[in-house]
Structures are given as structure tokens and as C-alpha cells.
Amino acid sequence: MGQKILRDGGHLEPSVQQWDWLGHGIYFWEGNPGRAMAWAVQRQKEGKIEAPFVLGAIIDLRHCLDLFDHDGLAQVKQAHRLLMQVSVAAGTKVPRNVGATADRAGRGLDCAVMNTLHQYRKERQELAYDSVRGPFLEGEEIYPGAGFRSENHIQLSVRNAECVKGYFRPLHSKAASF
């Protein structure tokens, strides 16, 4: 897919999976081609892709919901309250985040909250977010008792494809060792 985009143009397709923790959009790792390649290699081992490939992108985040920002997190918290109220009123079950690892990779609740936030803004005719940016804490502790994990990264969900200015094949780097 990546080579086809570089050769023929076009865009990656937005993901609309129920576990898309930043809501639906085109997902990227921010500035971390090594982590992207490690993920692609793992997908190959699982038989989900044939050849690992990393596609870089030049992205203008534009109007971004930044989950490193206090106000951004407050909006997400409010969207969760709204989702809970709507679910109770409608008698529907709220999705849950599930998974055997600390990152709980099946992020159904987070996806529902983010999509609720975007729908609420749309209904109120507020400016739509073009992108969402947040920390993804993943993997094992890098040493006993560490707050750092082996696969931490910043993830982007681009909701507006016009934010993607172009694609490129990044130069890959390996983790430093000493």
C-alpha cells in the first residue's frame, strides 16, 4: 500500500475500527519510524501483511485536539460524561477498553468517547477537529518499577485528509546503545 501511494499518489484510508482509541481517522506514529517498522514486522509475523513498509507523511495538524493539553483532556472527560448520560437514557451498553496488557489495546470505550466528542461538536456547529494527538503508553517496563515502557509513542489520528501534505519513505534509524 505504501509503495503504491508513493508511486501513484492518493491517500491512506481512514480507519473506522471500534478500537481506534483517538476516534476514526488516518493513524500515524509521530516522528518514530523505528517503532512503525517494528509494528509492521510484527504484523508480518502474524501473517497480516506480506512485506513491512513504513510510509512517512508531512502533516499540518491544523485544528488539533491535543491530549497533552489540559483543555483537550477536559473536553474528552466531558465527552465521556455525555456518552454515559446518553447510554443510560437510551438503555444501551457502553463499550469497554479490553486487553490483557497494560495498554488495553482494545480501546472501544476510548473510541466511543472520541467519536461522541466529534459528533457533539458537529451538532453544536463548533469547529471540527482536523486531527487528534495523544500519548500511547505501550509495552513492558524498560526496567523494574519504571514508568517508561518499551513501546511508548505519540500517535496521531488525522480526521481531515487535507492535513496530509505529502508522503515519503523515511530513513530508518536504530535505537542507540551504549
Pin down the residues of each PLM region:
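Active-site and NAD+-binding cores of ADP-ribose-processing enzymes
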Residues: 2-3, 7, 11, 54-178
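Amphipathic alpha-helical interaction segments
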Residues: 29, 35-37, 47, 128, ...
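Extracellular structured ligand-interaction cores
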Residues: 23-26, 52-58
